[in-house]
Swiss-Prot record:
One of its GO terms (molecular function) is RNA binding. It comes from Saccharomyces cerevisiae (strain ATCC 204508 / S288c). Residues 153-165, 440-456 have a biased composition (Low complexity). Residues 467-478 have a biased composition (Basic and acidic residues). The record marks 439-440 as: Cleavage. GO terms for cellular component: cytoplasm. Homotrimer. Capsid protein (CA) is the structural component of the virus-like particle (VLP), forming the shell that encapsulates the retrotransposons dimeric RNA genome. The particles are assembled from trimer-clustered units and there are holes in the capsid shells that allow for the diffusion of macromolecules. CA also has nucleocapsid-like chaperone activity, promoting primer tRNA(i)-Met annealing to the multipartite primer-binding site (PBS), dimerization of Ty1 RNA and initiation of reverse transcription. It is found in: Cytoplasm. This is Transposon Ty1-H Gag polyprotein. It comes from the Eukaryota. Residues 1-10, 48-60, 127-152, 457-466 have a biased composition (Polar residues). Keywords: Cytoplasm, RNA-binding, Transposable element.
Length: 478
């Protein structure tokens, strides 16, 4: 029947039947789809006449242009203007290929799916860098491709795209066993070096820093080493500060590096529970883990400082008792809130050990009271402090004149010390020697004078000598 129908169209050769569907040489108004080979032979002549007399759309507009039809005489057809599919509704080639791949003429020409890479190795772009993926995603590098005879390692196109241009570096193989992890880390470090990231891998004795986390209890110390590792990698600006905010905003590449290094050096089975809780919500939120770790380190430092302060308390009344009580109670409350419980007995012993001065006797008056509380101890401290303040206020504030104190000191010395005869100030002007003085005395005794009579009057009276020769004799010496 197909041969009979084709004989009705003298302009169409049997070899170019497919090309005639879109050819401009079709002069009939009959739809070629109505006379296809799928039609049965029961069509009569009446139905054929009815179909031929109908005013239908030209055959060229009913079938869209097929650019890839294997026709020996391809013919170009202008886009339809009045067919059932308007021109503005037809898909363009770019719309049909949103991924931007080259258009393949035959399904057999489409290549197989490329090597499945871990999401952390995706090239930079608008796509998500951290999609969730199961552990089964990805294949080892040794796995052959779907096409026989071609493997990923032997693909020249892959080598030219990934290794020769250095735009994308071949990722390390998939880790399949915990026992292979040491060797896999070496491969990963080699991958970083090939990615021009070898300068950010500090080493100590040939081993990468930070060390591997091997226990949840070692996580606080490991985080300190990891933060030092980031600082050595010129990433100190993204580390959260005391207020929990970094100095600068982290970039996507830095976040990728942060995620990869944390995942390598801190295996999930060795993470503490609170770290796992954060990763269960967002497994890429490494910044939150660092922020919480810094807060815990500060809290641990504060706890150590509080314990040292409480063990070395000293009080002698030089500061107000209220300030001393506030300081001690705040330290005890902080330690109790952080899980370090200080009971009343221990607290009272630490407080009483630091008391001195008038407060020292509290060690002995209260030592028998086993149920004494910190509040009761501070009641006694307040009582002593108020008594000290009252005694200081009752003392007179009069200050003696310095001149009065000077006069009192003079009179005191005159009454206690024996009176000393002062020498004549003219002594310094007398330059006579002792021999000359003796000669004068002897001559004065031989010569008659009234002074000799006064000397010989009585031996019991004190001897009085003129002060002519500056001689002074004490009566008790004779």
């Amino acid at each position: 029947m197909e041969s009979q129908q084709l004989s009705n169209y003298p302009h169409i050769s049997h070899g170019s039947a497919c090309a005639s569907v879109t050819s401009k040489e079709v002069h009939t108004n009959q739809d070629p789809l109505d006379v296809s080979a799928s039609k049965i032979q029961e069509y009569d002549k009446a139905s054929t006449k009815a179909n031929s007399q109908q005013t239908t759309t030209p055959a060229s507009s009913a079938v869209p242009e097929n650019l890839h039809h294997a026709s020996p005489q391809p013919a170009s057809v202008p886009p339809p203007q009045n067919g059932p599919y308007p021109q503005q509704c037809m898909m363009t080639q770019n719309q049909a290929n949103p991924s931007g791949w080259s258009f393949y003429g035959h399904p057999s020409m489409i290549p197989y799916t490329p090597y499945q890479m871990s999401p952390m190795y995706f090239p930079p772009g608008p796509q998500s860098q951290f999609p969730q993926y199961p552990s089964s995603v990805g294949t080892p590098l040794s796995t052959p491709s779907p096409e026989s005879g071609n493997t990923f390692t032997d693909s020249s196109s892959a080598d030219s795209d990934m290794t020769s241009t250095k735009k994308y570096v071949r990722p390390p193989p998939m880790l399949t066993s915990p026992n292979d992890f040491p060797n896999w880390v070496k491969t990963y470090i080699k991958f970083l070096q090939n990615s021009n990231l070898g300068g950010i891998i500090p080493t100590v004795n040939g081993k990468p820093v930070p060390p591997m986390l091997t226990s949840p209890n070692d996580f606080p110390n490991w985080v300190k080493t990891y933060i030092k590792f980031l600082q050595n990698s010129n990433l100190g600006g993204i580390i959260p500060t005391v207020n929990g905010k970094p100095v600068r905003q982290i970039t996507d590449d830095e976040l990728t590096f942060l995620y990869n290094t944390f995942q390598i050096f801190a295996p999930s089975q060795f993470l503490p529970t609170w770290v796992k809780d954060i990763l269960s919500v967002d497994y890429t939120d490494i910044m939150k883990i660092l922020s919480k770790s810094i807060e815990k380190m500060q809290s641990d430092t504060q706890e150590a400082n509080d314990i040292v302060t409480l063990a070395n308390l000293q009080y002698n009344g030089s500061t107000p008792a209220d300030a001393f009580e506030t300081k001690v109670t705040n330290i005890i409350d902080r330690l109790n809130n952080n899980g370090i419980h200080i009971n009343n007995k221990v607290a009272c012993q630490l407080i009483m050990r630091g008391l001195s001065g008038e407060y020292k006797f509290l060690r002995y008056t209260r030592h028998r009271h086993l149920n004494m509380t910190v509040a009761e101890l501070f009641l006694d401290i307040h009582a002593i402090y108020e008594e000290q303040q009252g005694s200081r206020n009752s003392k007179p504030n009069y200050r003696r004149n310095p001149s009065d104190e000077k006069n009192d000191s003079r009179s005191y010395t005159n009454t206690t010390k024996p009176k000393v005869i002062a020498r004549n100030p003219q002594k310094t002007n007398n330059s006579k020697s002792k021999t000359a003085r003796a000669h004068n005395v002897s001559t004065s005794n031989n010569s008659p004078s009234t002074d000799n009579d006064s000397i010989s009057k009585s031996t019991t009276e004190p001897i009085q000598l003129n002060n002519k020769h500056d001689l002074h004799l004490r009566p008790e010496t004779y």
